[in-house]
Amino acid sequence: MAKLHRLISAVLRLAAAGAAAAAAVIMVTSHETTSLFGIEMEAKYSYTPSFVFFVVAFAVTFAYSLLAAVLVRPGTTASRLVLLSDVTVGMLLTGAVAATGAISQVGKSGNEHAGWLPICAQVQAYCGHVMGALIAGFVSLLLYFLIIMYSLHAVAEPLCSCH
């Protein structure tokens, strides 16, 4: 049973690492230059602080997921510390996806009340990259939710006499 726990944990963590790496790489490669009324406009992820936060959060998640997949053995005392770290990473990912999603919505739809115009009609490839990064980010976040639920089960299972 311990080998099965370790295998499931490793597979979930490696999948989360892959999704996190994809999210970071897709966001980093989001770049487009266009001309609007003779004025050159450049859209790049590094111009938006929430997108930079997104890249850093998912890069950290990638590294942590790989380390945890290799080093963590479910059911050990250390797995409880890793569970705490998993929850922290889950909160980090939630913040990154939420911040990026909010800014993306403004980029797509603008904000009439603030006088902000939408930009996605002018830089469609850029906005497509950002959307792809968000999708990969949501997948990674969902996998971290599953990791947390599975880790809670693995930690609580030896404590429960109900089996």
From Swiss-Prot:
<feature type="transmembrane region" description="Helical">
    <location>
        <begin position="8"/>
        <end position="28"/>
    </location>
</feature>
<feature type="topological domain" description="Cytoplasmic">
    <location>
        <begin position="1"/>
        <end position="7"/>
    </location>
</feature>
<feature type="topological domain" description="Extracellular">
    <location>
        <begin position="102"/>
        <end position="129"/>
    </location>
</feature>
<dbReference type="GO" id="GO:0035264">
    <property type="term" value="P:multicellular organism growth"/>
</dbReference>
<protein>
    <recommendedName>
        <fullName>CASP-like protein 1C2</fullName>
    </recommendedName>
</protein>
<feature type="topological domain" description="Cytoplasmic">
    <location>
        <begin position="151"/>
        <end position="163"/>
    </location>
</feature>
<keyword id="KW-1133">Transmembrane helix</keyword>
<dbReference type="GO" id="GO:0005886">
    <property type="term" value="C:plasma membrane"/>
</dbReference>
<comment type="similarity">
    <text>Belongs to the Casparian strip membrane proteins (CASP) family.</text>
</comment>
<dbReference type="GO" id="GO:0009733">
    <property type="term" value="P:response to auxin"/>
</dbReference>
<keyword id="KW-1003">Cell membrane</keyword>
<feature type="topological domain" description="Cytoplasmic">
    <location>
        <begin position="72"/>
        <end position="80"/>
    </location>
</feature>
<feature type="transmembrane region" description="Helical">
    <location>
        <begin position="130"/>
        <end position="150"/>
    </location>
</feature>
<feature type="topological domain" description="Extracellular">
    <location>
        <begin position="29"/>
        <end position="50"/>
    </location>
</feature>
<comment type="subunit">
    <text>Homodimer and heterodimers.</text>
</comment>
<keyword id="KW-0812">Transmembrane</keyword>
<dbReference type="InterPro" id="IPR006459">
    <property type="entry name" value="CASP/CASPL"/>
</dbReference>
<dbReference type="InterPro" id="IPR044173">
    <property type="entry name" value="CASPL"/>
</dbReference>
<dbReference type="Pfam" id="PF04535">
    <property type="entry name" value="CASP_dom"/>
</dbReference>
<feature type="transmembrane region" description="Helical">
    <location>
        <begin position="81"/>
        <end position="101"/>
    </location>
</feature>
<dbReference type="InterPro" id="IPR006702">
    <property type="entry name" value="CASP_dom"/>
</dbReference>
<dbReference type="GO" id="GO:0009741">
    <property type="term" value="P:response to brassinosteroid"/>
</dbReference>
<feature type="transmembrane region" description="Helical">
    <location>
        <begin position="51"/>
        <end position="71"/>
    </location>
</feature>
<dbReference type="GO" id="GO:0009826">
    <property type="term" value="P:unidimensional cell growth"/>
</dbReference>
<keyword id="KW-0472">Membrane</keyword>
